[in-house]
UniProtKB/Swiss-Prot annotation:
The keyword RNA-binding applies. HAMAP family: Ribosomal_uL18_B. The gene is rplR. Belongs to the universal ribosomal protein uL18 family. Coiled coil: none annotated. InterPro entries: Ribosomal_uL18_bac-type, Ribosomal_uL18_bac/euk. GO terms for molecular function: 5S rRNA binding; structural constituent of ribosome. It comes from the Bacteria. This is Large ribosomal subunit protein uL18. CDD domains: Ribosomal_L18_L5e (cd00432).
Length: 117
C-alpha cells in the first residue's frame, strides 16, 4: 500500500464515523502549494462554506501559499464565513493528513475565529 492509498483509507474510516454522527464537517485538503477548507452539510451533498489559498482575496495577502501562515489565513476565513451563515459547531475532518503543521495551523485559526470543534 502506498502513501496516498493509506491516507485515503484513513480518511474513509473517519468519514464513515462522522456520517453516523450526522455532523457538519470542516474538511481540509492540502497539496504542497495550496490548502483548501470546506464546511460540508451533514448529508454530505452540499458545500456550505469554502475557502482556499487559490482564492484571489486570500492569496493577495500571502507571500507564499504553502506554509502555516497561509493555512492560518484560510482557517480564519472559513470560520468567519461559517459564522456568517450561522454555523458554530463542526467536526474536524483532516482527510487522513497528520494533525501537524499546516493542518494544525488551520484548525487553531478556525478555533480562534469562533468555530467550535
Amino acid at each position: 500500500m502506498d502513501k496516498k492509498a493509506a491516507r485515503i483509507r484513513r480518511a474513509t474510516r473517519a468519514r464513515r464515523k462522522l456520517k453516523e454522527l450526522g455532523a457538519t464537517r470542516l474538511v481540509v485538503h492540502r497539496t504542497p502549494r495550496h490548502i483548501y477548507a470546506q464546511v460540508i452539510a451533514p448529508n454530505g451533498s452540499e458545500i456550505l462554506v469554502a475557502a482556499s489559498t487559490v482564492e484571489k482575496a486570500i492569496n493577495e495577502q500571502l507571500k507564499y501559499a504553502g506554509n502555516k501562515d497561509a493555512a492560518a489565513a484560510v482557517g480564519k476565513a472559513v470560520a468567519e464565513r461559517a459564522l456568517e451563515k450561522g454555523i458554530t459547531k463542526v467536526s474536524f475532518d483532516r482527510s487522513g493528513f497528520q494533525y501537524h503543521g499546516r493542518v494544525q495551523a488551520l484548525a487553531d485559526a478556525a478555533r480562534e475565529a469562533g468555530l467550535q470543534f
